Amino acid sequence: MKRINIALAGLAVVVMFTGCKSLYGKYERPDVNTQGLYRDPVSLTDTLAVSDTTSFGNMPWRSVFTDPQLQSLIQTALDNNVNMLNAALNVKMVEEALKVARLAFLPSVAFTPQGTIAKFDDNPVTKSYQLPLSASWNVDLFGNLLNAKRSAQMQLLATQDYQTVVKTNLISGVANLYYTLLMLDRQIEIVGEMEGLTKETWEKMQVMKDTRIGYRSTAVQSAEAAYYSVQAQRIDLQRQVREMENSLSLLLGQPAQTIQRGTFEGQSLPQDLATGVGIQLLNNRADVHAAELTLAQCFYDVNQARSRFYPQITITGTGAFTNQNGLVNPGKMLWSAVGSLVQPIFQHGQIVAGLKVAKMQYEQAYNTWQNTILQAGNEVSNALVQYNSAAEKAEFDAKRVEVLKKNVEDTRTMMSQSANTSYLEVITAQSNLLNAEISQVTDDFNKMQAVVNLYQALGGGAK
């Protein structure tokens, strides 16, 4: 034991002069530039200014999506979605791996009882037994176990963040599909109204053909075709509704079914869409945070790879109760203690290659982290421009709808009062009005979708 103590003391001195800082160092965030991380397009309202310090992404999801039916759907998805369930299992698996890394600091203990019965010729039967209890302790003088534990801790935190990523993606996915259904419902209503209007126009033209001399049958045919076109458009929208319901049911972890929902006009989303400063994405976005934790994990993997160049020190002790003849008196205790030191000299290049690979994996993790930050900024920029463009376009579409409604009314009146009005003017006016009203609903939906996408891009949904 005295020799072991001397060896340990000598190695401790060696550690002091061989850069133990590189073996025990803790991860520190590298420099990252978040200036101009996302664009600040000229917004239509002051609520879109990105200079605010409070981020829209910090709001709880129930405060953002206040529709009770949507809240119920989101909660169902969080409880039943397969990806959410698997993400939770991944966290539990990594937790078990961390427990193993922590227990590695403790001695390993083994109990290996043995018994022997022997008989030679006419000699009496001899019975012997041995009840050994052995313990082996790896002295973590060079940080191998410490860095393995820290790496496992980072892996656990990163896995928990990925679970949050799944949650935020699921919330935004359910919300977008829900609002898509509401948009389609409203468009079906508009098409239904236009269906009645085009049918009425067709019937009027039929009467005019029968009562006016020289009224062409082509006008009636065009009006009839316009009516059928609107009917076909309604069927197409109904198909899209069924597809959206099927997709939403899949996110809910349920068979395809009819989705209970509110109305498009009854939706209310927050108007304060402050994005906060770019550095907040490093804390709010779970995927950005997870990417940095993966970088930290690789940092500790590099430390662990360096520690393999140093000796491995193991202390082993054994105690046994035995009656083996020739060793000790029957029923006595046997004790032994051994200290061993293994210094790698030639490992076929495995240790050197392991360190090089660990360093390259660290560089890859750093690049991935940087790219994740850029991608987050890109998503924020896209959501902002989507909201602004939809809001700006909605103003023009609203004016267009107002003008076209009057145009339809005027052309219908003129058609019934004068033969100078072409049937094409009536049909064209109705078609233009339908397209404008559909576009107006799409604009409102795009604003809703932009709010959902911005909320997700800012890390919303974690709370």
Locations of regions flagged by a protein language model:
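Small/polar, glycine/serine/threonine/aspartate-rich low-complexity segments that form flexible
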Residues: 40, 47-66, 70, 75, ...
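Transmembrane beta-barrel architecture of outer-membrane proteins
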Residues: 72, 86, 128-130, 176, ...
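Sec/SRP-type N-terminal targeting helices
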Residues: 85-86, 102-103, 139-170, 218, ...
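Periplasmic alpha-helical coiled-coil/stalk elements that build and connect Gram-negative outer-membrane
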Residues: 154, 161-277, 386, 390
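Short segments within alpha-helical structural elements
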Residues: 195, 199, 229-257, 399-458
